[in-house]
Amino acid sequence: MEGKILIVDDQYGIRVLLHEVFQKEGYQTFQAANGFQALDIVKKDNPDLVVLDMKIPGMDGIEIFKACKEIDESIKVILMSAYGELDMIQEAKDLGALMHFAKPFDIDEIRQAVRNELAVEA
């Protein structure tokens, strides 16, 4: 597998878990704990896909999503959320988010979703 994935979540454990899963799949992965780190990585490393938590202190998921799209219109985004933030999720989907996973998510489902999205590009 090829492709670059950015994991954006303020929870260290989630970032590490997804990092390990996607690295085993052969993807190059980047991690960000907040929006500022995420946008820096998007500018420097040009990831193909972002796995983005909606509830992050400081810059929230919608702000991060919009800023990522301003930097790279073609970037793909998959959302994660631990809360029933239906308004935020709908807004992100309206802006072009591919899908949403509620935490706790099934790791195999998110792995398959990423595989499917990055395979479309290849």
Curated annotation (Swiss-Prot):
GO CC term, one of those recorded: cytoplasm
SUPFAM superfamilies, per database record: CheY-like (SSF52172)
Domain Response regulatory: 4-118
Cofactor: Mg(2+)
SMART domains cross-referenced by the UniProt entry: REC (SM00448)
PTM: Phosphorylated by KinA and KinB.
Top-rank EC class of the record's enzyme: transferase
Principal subcellular localisation of the protein: cytoplasm
E.C. number(s) listed in UniProt: 2.7.-.-
Matches recorded under PROSITE patterns: RESPONSE_REGULATORY
PANTHER family: RESPONSE REGULATORY DOMAIN-CONTAINING PROTEIN, STRESS RESPONSE REGULATOR PROTEIN 1
Protein name: Sporulation initiation phosphotransferase F
Organism: Bacillus thuringiensis subsp. kurstaki
Encoding gene, per UniProt annotation: spo0F
